UniProtKB/Swiss-Prot annotation:
Residues 427-434 are annotated as: G1. Residues 75-87, 151-169, 202-211 have a biased composition (Low complexity). It is found in: Cytoplasm. This is Translation initiation factor IF-2. InterPro entries: EF-G-like_DII, IF2_II, IF2_N, P-loop_NTPase, Small_GTP-bd, T_Tr_GTP-bd_dom, TF_IF2_bacterial-like, TIF_IF2. It comes from Corynebacterium jeikeium (strain K411).
Length: 922
């Protein structure tokens, strides 16, 4: 067949249904969708070969019987009823002229059995010289008869006549054969046609042999039983097809013996007397006289092997989209990765992943960050094990890609030198932490703090004299307010020893317990300073007993924790406290670092200075930081232009445990970010850009909310959202304010959304963003600059300024509560009983009532009750009269007439009058 065919056209040509052909094509590994799909010519040829049609369409004229040769010899007429499904009176049954699906375009359904003619030999003038004496039950034509007039015989060049019983022309008379006839494959038996070996040709078994000998085509012939029209499948069933050896002597049935060398079949019948496995064709002759292939063994065919291989390599189908099959492979993705990153890992098209997620009900773009759950779900669908890398591991891998490492000293043990201990002062708010540092530094830090509370981390290095030797100690002062949890945790991670300050007159408080937990999590030793022992009501022993419950057991009680009773205000026992700190450091810690390596440290604070730009407070942990070094701090990078110590003096280099302020960064770093010195500015910029992209992706993935069917109803409801823009004087304060605001829990009806935050003054850009998003700007220790105030007034943007953090928290919480939908409570005003009903043409029914309790007011809401059942829940008193006067209210004990908005009223009904009072939300 030239050109392409559609599936339904090919099915019609093959004589099967489109559904069966589609199933066969899919079994063969050809992916077609519908019956209208086109099929390539090689596939058409393969399907014709599979269904045993071959080139029948091209040879139709050779196989179509002619109605001119109906009469046939009588033996054929007797054999036909045996082989046909329905016996007919004529020797040639009606199904004979029907087209036969046959791989042999010349031979018909009744191809002559056991005729073996080798190529190159002259065919014998008679197909056989002997009749089969053992199987013959009826007379057969004489062997000397001429082959020309035999039924089904076709002379060269002449049209073949009708073949009684569906007999095929003699092989020697094949008009398409150029030489000696070759072996032909057996046709498929059809209903009403004689099977192989049934034709009463000379030299073959006569049709009556079925009564005495083995049944041709039966179980003993090696090709399975003869199919009947009722048993015929829609396409060839290998288990029931006759073996090729039933038709030609050169064939061989599966498991049977070779047939005879030609002429009539032996006593066992062609193909061997034993029953072989049906379904597999033997080694048969090729078409048009070409030699056939070797017989198949019990091994798998190439087609089967290919199908198995394709099944193993079959792609995964996710949401109707073909995607690679991971086969359990593990891939690592960063938190907040996009589908583009996923596609790059698995060598797939990102558009296919987008389409797959869209079909699964998730609408994302290729570059949009997706949540960890979505990445894992998509990986499971494709048989990939997705591992979401933690930020710490991802940052370590990022540094390793640049051949950098953070957190370990370089060099040998002899390269390490002693460094000062880093001590963090922690405790509850207003327990005297900053006063203690003031006393140690002999300075007044607390007076500069708004509200008398510390709102950022201070880093100082002081010299302490111990046993006649001056030693340096670095102190970190952390906030004690509950809003600064992240700062205290960051201070604990950056320190060697913690001083826990507890007021002797106040005892253990919530932030005290939190500080203990931070110290335990960081695995650092704790020295307890019991402060305010000079005040009345101080109970140092009670403090020791309370802290015992949290694992801090004093040395006098047999524990390992040093307790020192001090008075920061009076300066009592301060030297003893410092000595205890140094003793703990010497006894418990190995405080050494390599000062000769590239500097590494941590940023404990960062802010934006108007004249100096971004400023970061750094504690060097190892190595030496010098002016001019290229540094990267989190997602900020730059070159050290200037370093300032705690006294405001410039320093050229800072060794281990030295706190300094660093100028020269391109942006404000995050509090708690690691500092790293690199060789080139380009490397620093690349690391910072990668970190910034990772941070933004993680933030986008965290802010995306997945909506399920369960919470769809609540999402569709109207939700009030308070949008905020936070600006502060330093990064730590902004971080603490954001954490505190996000912890406010009011109700599900309102939501708090922080759309932007930053360090520095409120700019015009912030005001424009607030105007576009209907947000409120909160400035903490900063003011608006330039034209920001004018633009805010013109746009109606609300800017709030705060210097104390808990005041900002209280006002934001109050604003959220004000956004809640009001709750109304019903308050009963009075009741009235209907005594009589009057009819008025202008207003309808008028209820003549007696006010029993309270008052009845005009336009008030009322409830109509009849026999204890509520008849009308919400009705209104439209008109109220006392005698003939319109009144606004009538008190108890008086009669009145009223008109209700609900007309169905009866005598003895009770009217309950009430009003709705708004209840404030808390």
């Amino acid at each position: 067949m030239a050109g392409k065919l559609r599936v339904h056209e090919l099915a019609k040509e093959l004589g099967v249904t489109s559904k069966e052909l589609l199933a066969t094509l899919k079994e063969q590994g050809e992916f077609v969708k519908t019956a209208s799909s086109t099929v390539q010519p090689p596939v058409v040829k393969k399907m014709k070969k599979h269904y045993g049609v071959g080139e029948e369409s091209a040879k139709e004229s050779a196989t179509t019987p002619s109605p001119a040769a109906k009469p046939g010899p009588k033996p054929a007429a007797k054999a036909a009823p045996k082989a046909a499904a329905k016996p007919g009176p004529k020797p040639g049954p009606k199904p004979g002229p029907q087209p036969v699906k046959n791989t042999n375009p010349v031979a018909g359904a009744g191809t002559r059995p056991t005729s073996t003619v080798k190529p190159g030999e002259k065919p014998a003038p008679k197909p056989g010289a002997k009749p089969a004496p053992k199987t013959a039950a009826k007379p057969t034509p004489k062997p000397g008869a001429k082959p020309g007039p035999k039924p089904g015989g076709a002379k060269p060049g002449a049209k073949p006549g009708p073949k009684p019983g569906g007999r095929a022309p003699r092989v020697a008379n094949n008009p398409f054969s150029s030489g000696a006839p070759a072996e032909r494959p057996a046709p498929r038996p059809r209903g009403g046609q004689a099977g192989p070996g049934d034709m009463p040709r000379p030299g073959s078994r006569p049709g009556g042999a079925k009564k005495a000998g083995p049944k041709p085509g039966g179980a003993k012939q090696g090709g399975g039983r003869r199919p009947s029209p009722a048993m015929m499948p829609s396409h060839p069933n290998p288990a029931q097809m006759p073996s090729k050896s039933d038709n030609f002597g050169g064939g061989r049935g599966r498991g049977g013996r070779h047939g005879g060398p030609g002429g009539p079949g032996g006593p066992g019948g062609p193909g061997g007397p034993r029953g072989g496995r049906g379904g597999r064709r033997g080694g048969t002759a090729g078409a048009f006289g070409r030699p056939g292939g070797a017989p198949r063994k019990g091994r798998k065919s190439k087609r089967q092997k290919r199908n198995e291989y394709e099944a193993m390599q079959a792609p995964s189908v996710v949401g109707g989209v073909k995607l690679p099959n991971g086969k359990g492979a593990k891939i690592r993705l960063a938190r907040g990765a996009s589908l583009m990153d996923f596609a790059e890992k698995i060598k797939a098209d990102a558009a296919a992943l987008v389409q797959a997620l869209f079909n699964l009900g998730e609408m994302v773009t290729a570059t949009q960050s997706v949540s960890d759950e979505t990445l894992m779900l998509l990986g499971e669908e494709m048989d990939y094990k997705v591992e979401v890398v933690s930020p710490e591991d991802e940052d370590r891998e990022l540094l390793e890609s640049f051949d950098l490492q953070f957190g370990e000293d370089e060099g040998e043990d002899e390269d390490l030198a002693q460094r000062p201990p880093v001590v963090t002062v922690m405790g509850h708010v207003d327990h005297g932490k900053t006063r203690l540092l003031d006393t140690i530094r002999k300075a007044n830090v607390g007076s500069g703090e708004a509200g008398g509370i510390t709102q950022h981390i201070g880093a100082y290095q002081v010299s302490v004299s111990m046993e006649g030797e001056d030693r340096l100690v670095t102190f970190l002062d952390t906030p004690g307010h509950e809003a600064f949890t992240a700062m205290r945790a960051r201070g604990a991670k950056s320190t060697d020893i913690a001083i826990l300050v507890v007021a002797a007159d106040d005892g253990v408080m919530p932030q005290t317990v939190e500080a203990i937990n931070h110290a335990k999590a960081a695995d650092i030793p704790v020295v307890v300073a019991v402060n305010k022992i000079d005040k009345e009501g101080a109970q140092p022993d009670k403090i020791r007993g309370q802290l015992t419950e949290y694992g801090l057991i004093p040395e006098e009680y047999g524990g390992e924790t040093m307790f020192v009773d001090i008075s920061a205000k009076q300066g009592t026992n301060i030297d003893q406290l410092l000595e205890s700190v140094l003793l703990t450091a010497d006894a418990s810690l190995d405080l050494r670092a390599n000062p000769d390596m590239d500097a590494q440290g941590v940023a404990i604070e960062a802010h934006l200075d108007r004249g100096r730009g971004p400023v970061a407070t750094i504690i060097v942990q190892r190595g030496t930081l010098r002016v001019g070094d290229s540094i990267v701090v989190g997602d900020a990078y730059g070159r050290v232009r200037r370093m300032i110590d705690e006294h405001g003096n410039d320093v050229q280099e800072a060794g281990p445990s030295r706190p300094v302020q660093v100028l020269g960064l391109t942006s404000v770093s995050g509090a708690g970010d690691n500092l790293l010195v690199v060789d080139e500015d380009r490397t620093a910029r690349q690391i910072a850009d990668r970190r910034d992209a990772r941070r933004r992706n993680a933030l986008a993935a965290r802010s995306r909310k997945r909506v399920s069917l369960e919470d769809l109803d609540s999402v569709l409801k109207e939700t009030n959202t308070l949008n905020l823009i936070l600006k502060g004087d330093n990064a730590g304060t902004v971080e603490a304010l954001e954490d505190a605001l996000l912890k406010i829990e009011v109700d599900d009806e309102v939501d708090l959304n922080i759309i932007d935050r930053g360090v520095g003054a409120v700019t015009e850009t912030n005001v424009n963003l607030a105007a576009a998003s209907d947000a409120v700007i909160i400035g903490f220790n900063v003011r608006a600059e330039g034209k920001a105030t004018e633009v805010a007034n013109a746009e109606g943007v609300d800017i709030r300024y705060y210097s104390i953090i808990y005041k900002a928290i209280e006002e934001v919480e109050a604003a959220l509560k004000g956004m809640l939908k009001p709750i109304y409570e019903e308050k009963q005003i009075g009741t009235a009983e209907i005594r009589q009903i009057f009819k008025a043409s202008s207003v309808g029914l008028i209820a003549g009532c007696m006010v029993e309790t309270g008052k009845v007011r005009r336009n008030a809401q009322a409830r109509l009750v009849r026999d204890g059942n509520v008849v009308a829940e919400k009705t209104t008193i439209e008109s109220l009269r006392r005698e003939k006067d319109d009144v606004t209210e009538v008190s108890a004990g008086y009669e009145c007439g009223m008109v209700l908005s609900y007309p169905d009223i009866q005598v003895d009904d009770i009217i309950e009058v009430f009003e709705l009072v708004e209840v404030p939300r808390t």
